A protein has these predicted regions:
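The feature captures the beta-strand-to-loop junction immediately N-terminal to the Walker
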Residues: 52-54
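Helix-to-loop junction immediately C-terminal to a conserved catalytic motif
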Residues: 67
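Conserved ABC transporter NBD signature motif
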Residues: 75-82, 95, 123-128
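ABC ATPase NBD coupling module
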Residues: 83-104, 137-138
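ABC ATPase C-loop
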Residues: 157-158
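Helical segment within the ABC ATPase nucleotide-binding domain
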Residues: 180-192
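H-loop (His-switch) and adjacent beta-strand-loop-beta switch element
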Residues: 214-219
C-alpha cells in the first residue's frame, strides 16, 4: 500500500494549518482493493502542495478520499477546523473544499459563460487570472482546446473562493507552457493567503518550482 514522504520546494510563508486542510490517517480503496494506507496531509491557507508519485501510487484516490468521493475505512478530514469526515461530497464543497477532477467535470454543450453562471460568477472574474478566458465566453466548452478547458475547470474552482482547492492531473494532455500558466495561476491563488492549494502534477520539476513542498506517494 502507498506510503508518503514530504519533500521541500520553493514557496511563500503559509497561514495557520487549522484554517486550511488537515487529513489524518486516511485509509481508502475500492471494494477489497486498498489503495491508501495511513495517508496524512496538512496544507495551510497560502500554501501550495504538490502530490507526486508514479501511476498507481494513489494520487487520484487521495484527492477523491479527501473530497468524500471514495469511502474511507479510517482517518479524519478537517477544513477550516470543521470535521468533514462524515460529510457528503456536496457538504464538503459547501464547507469550502473544492476539487477539480482529472476529467474536468465540464458540460460540452454549455458555453464557457454558462459554466460560470452555474456557480454564480462570471468569465471576467476568472479572466483576471487566465486572460485567455475573456475571449471564450460564448464558445461551447466542447469546442475549446484541452488547455482552454483546463483553464475553465480551474477557473471555476478559483472563483468559488474556496478554503481548499484540489486539482487532479493538472497538466494531463497539455503542453508544458500551458501547464506552466495554470501552475502560475494556482500559485497566485495561494499567495492571496485565503486558500490552501493541492495539485496532482506529472511535471515534477515545473510544479516543485512553484509549490511550497511536495508529498510523494509510493507504492
Amino acid at each position: 500500500l502507498p506510503g508518503n514522504t514530504s519533500v521541500s520546494a520553493g514557496g511563500a510563508a503559509a497561514g495557520d494549518i487549522a484554517q486550511g486542510l488537515s487529513a489524518e490517517g486516511l485509509c481508502a480503496g475500492y471494494g477489497d482493493a486498498k489503495v491508501l494506507s495511513d495517508l496524512s496531509l496538512q496544507v495551510a491557507p497560502g500554501e501550495m502542495v504538490a502530490v507526486l508519485g508514479r501511476n498507481g501510487a494513489g494520487k487520484t484516490t487521495a484527492l477523491m478520499a479527501i473530497a468524500g468521493l471514495v469511502p474511507t475505512d479510517s482517518g479524519t478530514v478537517r477544513v477550516g477546523g470543521a470535521d468533514l469526515t462524515r460529510a457528503s461530497p456536496g457538504a464538503r464543497v459547501g464547507a469550502g473544499l473544492v476539487s477539480v477532477p482529472d476529467d474536468r467535470g465540464l458540460f460540452p454543450s454549455l458555453s464557457v459563460a454558462e459554466h460560470f453562471s452555474l456557480v454564480g460568477s462570471s468569465v471576467d472574474e476568472a479572466a483576471e487570472t487566465f486572460p485567455a478566458l475573456a475571449g471564450l465566453a460564448g464558445r461551447r466548452v466542447g469546442a475549446c482546446s484541452g488547455g482552454e478547458q483546463q483553464q475553465v475547470a480551474v477557473g471555476l474552482g478559483m472563483v468559488r473562493r474556496p478554503k481548499v482547492l484540489m486539482v487532479d492531473e493538472l497538466s494531463m494532455g497539455l503542453a508544458p507552457q500551458v501547464a506552466a500558466e495554470l501552475l502560475a495561476g494556482l500559485r497566485a491563488l495561494a499567495d492571496a493567503g485565503e486558500t490552501a492549494v493541492v495539485v496532482v502534477e506529472q511535471f515534477v520539476d515545473a510544479v516543485l518550482a512553484v509549490a511550497d513542498r511536495g508529498l510523494v506517494l509510493s507504492e
